[in-house]
Swiss-Prot record:
Record keywords, A-Z: Ribonucleoprotein, Ribosomal protein
Protein name: Large ribosomal subunit protein uL6
A GO MF label: structural constituent of ribosome
Keyword Ribonucleoprotein: yes
InterPro entries: Ribosomal_uL6-like (IPR000702), Ribosomal_uL6-like_a/b-dom_sf (IPR036789), Ribosomal_uL6_a/b-dom (IPR020040), Ribosomal_uL6_CS2 (IPR002359)
Organism, scientific name: Drosophila melanogaster
Gene: RpL9
UniProt record, GO biological process: cytoplasmic translation
Length: 190
């Protein structure tokens, strides 16, 4: 039996401006603007009032109905991003050769040197809107920040993947840069 209608609403906070036009969602907050297209999904998206965004699917299959909640989660992440921002902390782990990390090009590129004593310099470019800095509070720590959770996590993943150990037993050679903490730039009141 097919579901006739499936819908979800996203509440938009007071300090956030949101707009939907032809399945392109734009969210503006204190930290900037995020824009995302959902044109690849056959869903109805509209704003019944200023503070509510409704995602709706009529006569959908199982996968199409699942996409309704997925889109809402993406929009909630956009709202959280422009309000608080996303921050990933990464730690350099090494047994013998100290890994040297240097940021360049206005904190958008990181150069990783002396990984396992290699002379090769690994350069990792961050996604647009993402910055990476060396932590002042903690030794061997990188802080990756941005408003878009997918860009931040993707950039952190690229850094981690750049330090994969080749032709060695990975159970023994654990050197690399790993994500140690996922948090927000503006600390949440708990």
């Amino acid at each position: 039996m097919r579901t006739i209608n499936s819908n979800q609403c996203v509440k938009i906070p007071k300090d956030i401006k949101a707009s939907v036009k032809a399945r392109v969602v734009t969210i503006t907050g204190t930290r900037g603007t995020l824009k995302r297209s959902f044109k690849h999904l056959a869903l109805d998206m509209y704003m019944p009032d200023k503070r509510t965004l409704k995602v709706e699917k009529w006569f959908g299959t199982k996968k199409e109905l699942a996409a309704v909640r997925t889109v809402c989660s993406h929009i909630e992440n956009m709202i959280k991003g422009v309000t608080f921002g996303f921050q990933y902390k990464m730690r350099a782990v090494y047994a013998h050769f100290p890994i040297n990390c240097v940021t360049s090009e206005n904190n958008t590129v990181i150069e990783i040197r002396n990984f396992l004593g290699e002379k090769y310099i690994r350069r990792v470019e961050m996604a647009p809107g993402v910055t990476v800095v060396n932590s002042t509070a903690q030794k061997d720590e990188l802080i990756v920040e941005g408003n878009d959770i997918e860009s931040v996590s993707g950039s952190a993943a690229l850094i981690q993947q750049s330090t994969t150990v080749k032709n060695k037993d990975i159970r023994k050679f654990l050197d690399g840069l790993y994500v140690s903490e996922k948090t927000t730039v503006v600390k949440l009141e708990s």
